[in-house]
A protein has these predicted regions:
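Sec-dependent signal peptide hydrophobic core
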Residues: 5-9
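A sequence/structural signal for flexible, mid-protein segments enriched
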Residues: 19-262
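C-terminal motif of bacterial Sec signal peptides marking the signal peptidase cleavage site
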Residues: 14-17
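Positively charged n-region of N-terminal signal peptides that target proteins for export
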Residues: 1-4, 20
């Protein structure tokens, strides 16, 4: 067995530029296709990255596949073949993410076909941020802690992912929640990051379908796996892609709020 570090960037927006590092345990010599893609209701273009685990690079980023055929479509009859941009990146030119649409993608590599789909659910609006100062204790560092607010719609089955930046630097933590606590109520999750006066906070909340939520929950487990005597890493790499590929293809609506600690 060997461990392979894979850098996943799919769950960040194109403007985000942050990556998640996932440690996969694969059989020696095993090759896996890795596919990463995200469609949002923000202006495109959107990208899909296609790579393979065998022969991974020194920095852990999997080598891109240059000769894949990548198609993205929706349930309204729109379809386009993505343009190759190098290093395994394939980019849309006309696709526009729309709430309520289901998006499909198909990747062909060496005669093998890999598919997935995702429904673009609406997202609640982040309407405000407050800060509370906390003294240092056994569980928290001294500083200001942000609480964000949004009206969660009634009806269970909503899922969300948060991307967080402090002073334009992305935070690494994977934060995904469901609506079990907030269903139909005013959501007020606290961000567990110590801030100081003058810090600039940016929070993006992305809607997820159930497959996206499950994927991120497993990613979070893998990210925080410590290797202790009572811990065990997940036996399977997370994926919502057919035919044994690793990775995730998703569709998300996005809401953004910016704030400064005063």
């Amino acid at each position: 067995m060997k461990n392979i570090l894979l850098f996943f960037s799919l769950i960040a927006l194109p403007l985000a530029g942050c990556e998640q590092v996932i440690d996969y345990e694969l059989e020696q010599g095993t090759e896996k296709i890795v596919i990463e893609g995200l469609v949002t209701d923000q202006p495109g273009p959107y990208t899909v990255r296609v790579s393979r685990t065998l022969g991974y690079l020194q920095n852990g980023r999997t080598p891109g596949i240059a000769d894949a055929e990548v198609t993205n479509s929706d349930d309204k009859g729109h379809s386009e073949v993505l343009q190759a941009k190098g290093e395994g990146i394939y980019q849309t030119s006309e696709l526009v993410g729309t709430i309520g649409n289901t998006y499909f993608f198909k990747v062909k590599v060496n005669g093998q076909e890999y598919t997935s789909q995702s429904y673009l659910k609406p997202v609640s609006i982040l309407d405000s941020v407050t800060y509370k100062f906390k003294e240092k204790n056994a569980e928290t560092d001294e500083g200001y802690y942000a609480t964000i607010y949004f009206q969660e719609p009634k009806g269970k089955g909503d899922y969300y992912r948060f991307n967080i930046w402090v002073n334009e630097e992305p935070e690494d933590d994977i934060v995904a929640i469901n609506d079990e606590v907030y269903d139909g109520n005013y959501g007020d999750p606290e961000i567990d990051i110590s801030l100081k006066k003058g810090d600039k906070l940016r929070v993006e909340m992305l809607s997820l379908d159930r497959a996206g939520y499950d994927f991120l929950r497993v990613l979070g487990t893998m990210q925080y796996y410590t290797g202790g005597p009572f811990d065990a890493p997940p036996s399977n790499a997370p994926s919502n892609i057919s035919n044994g590929a690793i990775g995730y293809f998703g569709a998300s609506a996005v809401t953004i709020i910016n704030s400064t600690v005063k």
